[in-house]
Amino acid sequence: EDQVAVDNPVRLIDAFIDKLDLQQLGFQKGAERSEGRPSYGPQVLLKLYLYGYLNKVRSSRKLERECIRNIELQWLLQGLHPNYHTIADFRKLHGVALQSMFRLYVHFLGDAGLLGKTTIAVDGSKFKAVNSKKNNYSQKKIDKHQQFIKEKAEKYLQELDELDKEEQTQSKEEVQPKRDKIKQGLEKLKERTIKYDMLQQQLNNTTDKQISTTDADSRSILITKSIVEVAYNVQNAVDDKHNLVVQTQATNSNDGKALHKAATQAKQNLQLQKEDSLMVLADKGYHTGAELQHCQQENMI
């Protein structure tokens, strides 16, 4: 207790989570097992989750290690140290509940008089995804791979024809290793054909022009004028009184289609009614006629 200062932010996390009705927000305790340790309560994992994001520690494995060696976490979790599987599953299963908790936190800030609720600024930030460029596919990329497979298969078949001719002058024992190697190559091409046929089907079933196989919602995005990365475009809305974030949402679209949705969600989080006016500041990347019209119709100017 003495090793955690009274003004340490970890105490705010502890007090805030302890006051929440987590079940009402949608957080569920893990299923009890007949053997092994009892499951962790959602408040333990939620405190760990928030601590990780506050201190820029997102990896489940790193959080597991921090639970053991970090004094602040030892205090916050009362000596408990969940494994990385439990931490990762908690995040995966409670996406909607975490959004509800964020809205409740914005309400808490408003009740504390920390929000002006008259002016917000909206801007986007690019965050690199776990998904690599290698595992991001467009129609052009799939076509390129399928064409390569087709050409490689034709080459293998030509080589088999040549081996048939060689058997007339060479023994079967001399030719067979080459034939086996070609057949192995054809089997690998068959597997790759199935892979890219499945990717093509996924691409056909989405309205986007690309798919990502690791982070499904991430997209290939222009980060700067010449650098493209597989990333998320995170929209943030900040209240002007104390520069506190009142809305955040990871998207895969560009800024031009994001203003109305970000501003509307921020207005809801601020507990403002549709007829209440809200000034929204944004750079020229958001200035599309349809988005501005939608905002104006809902008293966001």
Label for each model-derived stretch:
Residues 5, 9, 36-44, 59, ...:
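Secondary-structure capping and boundary motifs in well-ordered enzyme cores
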Residues 39-98:
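Short, positively charged, Gly/Tyr-enriched micro-motifs
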Residues 88-300:
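Polybasic low-complexity intrinsically disordered regions
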